[in-house]
Every structure is written in structure tokens, then in C-alpha cells.
């Protein structure tokens, strides 16, 4: 364990449940790496993701973005391909891109968008894109004919959230350089989206635990009952 991490750990009481402002403030103060660390939110939910009716998945545009330059690949043809290029997509194509991904194991992009008519083609590389979280999905707004809107939202700071096998959602909410106030705005937007996405089949306490941490720093726990205060 590094010296900086040990020093940072002393600032955070591991047994405490902070309010969101306190936790984010501590996370910013304990991010001591020599680069602009990403601040991440980790929420354990009271769901059983093995059941189809307890999946939590969606997307939300963070008001202050993520601080990350996002590279967007779009599968589209004709007018929709032109629309994607004009909207600022980094890569646009169809079967040619499928072949490139298959033959070169090519992943120089962060988000994949596809028009619905292209999903048959994209499906050929589902086994490759799926495990990397890159498969376009209607729930996250990445399967759409409105490619210009999808690209604009992604570039503006749209993040996808999805509960993993251990019932936890991991999501970036910005960079250390944002400061506490902007991080709090992003945190609140994402938490509100998670609360709205609560499955009807989920019983008992929904927000089990909430932690924020920087890339290299320790985590600060937030009181789940006061997450949106």
C-alpha cells in the first residue's frame, strides 16, 4: 500500500457514515495522485440481479459531464451515417467496422450506437462487445434512429449504469478537478436516476450502501438514508 494512500486513509473514518457533501469533500481531499483522478460512485442495491425483474439498468446525462473525452462509434448507413458524422461521431460504418472489430480485435472507442436496422449486423459481434459493456441497448438509448441526439448526449456526459452480479452499480461522476459542488450535482442526478429505476419486484431496503472514492484513494461511506439530502 502506497504512502499517499495510507496518509489519505487517516482522513477518512472507515466506521462513519457521512452525508454526501462531506464524503465528496473528503474524496477530493484524499485524491493525491499526480493526475486528475476520476471520482467514482459505488452503490450496493437491495436487488437480486439473477432475476430478470430485478435488473437495474439505464443511462443519465450528468449536468457537469464526466470530464472524460468519449469516443463514439456508430453503426449506420446512408442518411443516418451522414447524420452521425455531422453530429461528431468518431467512427461511422456498417459491415466494414464489424469486420475490422472481428479481424483486428479493435476497441479504440468508448460507446457504441446503432440504428435499429443495423442490429442484425451488430449482433454478429455481440459476443465480443457484450463482455466489454459496449453492446448497443435500447434501454440506454444507444439503439436509436435519432443518432444525432444520442451522440450529443454521450459527448455531453451521459453515463450508463448497470447493476453487476454482486448487486453493485459502479459509475464515474466526474474528476477531482470538478470540486465538491459540481461532483455533488452529478452525484444527486445519478442517485435520483437509480432511485427511479427501482424494480417493482425489489423488496426491503433498496439503497444498501453507498461509497465514493477516487481512482487511487480510499472510499468514504455515505448514509443511504440521507443520500439525497
From Swiss-Prot:
Pfam families: Ribosomal_L1. The keyword RNA-binding applies. GO terms for molecular function: rRNA binding; structural constituent of ribosome; tRNA binding. GO terms for biological process: regulation of translation; translation. It comes from the Bacteria. Keywords: Repressor, Ribonucleoprotein, Ribosomal protein, RNA-binding, rRNA-binding, Translation regulation, tRNA-binding. The keyword tRNA-binding applies. GO terms for cellular component: large ribosomal subunit. Belongs to the universal ribosomal protein uL1 family. Binds directly to 23S rRNA. The L1 stalk is quite mobile in the ribosome, and is involved in E site tRNA release. NCBIfam families: rplA_bact. Part of the 50S ribosomal subunit. PANTHER family: 54S RIBOSOMAL PROTEIN L1, MITOCHONDRIAL (PTHR36427), LARGE RIBOSOMAL SUBUNIT PROTEIN UL1M (PTHR36427:SF3). This is Large ribosomal subunit protein uL1. It comes from Clostridium botulinum (strain Eklund 17B / Type B).
Amino acid at each position: 500500500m502506497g504512502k499517499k494512500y495510507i496518509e489519505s486513509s487517516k482522513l477518512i473514518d472507515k466506521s462513519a457514515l457521512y452525508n454526501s457533501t462531506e464524503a465528496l469533500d473528503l474524496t477530493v481531499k484524499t485524491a493525491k495522485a499526480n493526475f486528475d483522478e476520476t471520482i467514482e460512485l459505488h452503490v450496493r442495491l437491495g436487488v437480486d440481479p439473477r432475476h430478470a425483474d430485478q435488473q437495474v439498468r439505464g443511462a443519465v446525462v450528468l449536468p457537469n459531464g464526466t470530464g472524460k473525452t468519449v469516443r463514439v462509434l456508430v453503426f449506420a448507413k446512408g442518411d443516418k451515417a451522414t447524420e452521425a458524422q455531422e453530429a461528431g461521431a468518431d467512427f461511422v460504418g456498417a459491415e466494414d467496422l464489424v469486420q475490422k472489430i472481428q479481424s483486428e480485435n479493435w476497441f479504440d472507442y468508448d460507446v457504441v450506437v446503432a440504428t435499429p436496422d443495423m442490429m442484425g449486423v451488430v449482433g454478429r459481434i455481440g459476443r465480443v462487445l457484450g463482455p466489454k459493456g459496449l453492446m448497443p441497448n435500447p434501454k440506454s438509448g444507444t439503439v436509436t434512429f435519432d443518432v444525432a441526439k444520442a451522440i450529443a448526449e454521450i459527448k455531453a456526459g451521459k453515463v450508463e449504469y448497470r447493476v453487476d452480479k454482486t448487486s453493485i452499480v459502479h459509475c464515474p461522476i466526474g474528476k477531482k478537478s470538478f470540486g465538491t459542488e459540481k461532483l455533488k450535482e452529478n452525484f444527486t442526478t445519478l442517485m435520483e436516476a437509480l432511485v427511479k429505476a427501482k424494480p417493482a419486484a425489489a423488496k426491503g431496503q433498496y439503497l444498501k450502501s453507498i461509497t465514493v472514492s477516487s481512482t487511487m484513494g480510499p472510499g468514504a461511506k455515505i448514509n443511504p438514508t440521507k443520500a439525497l439530502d
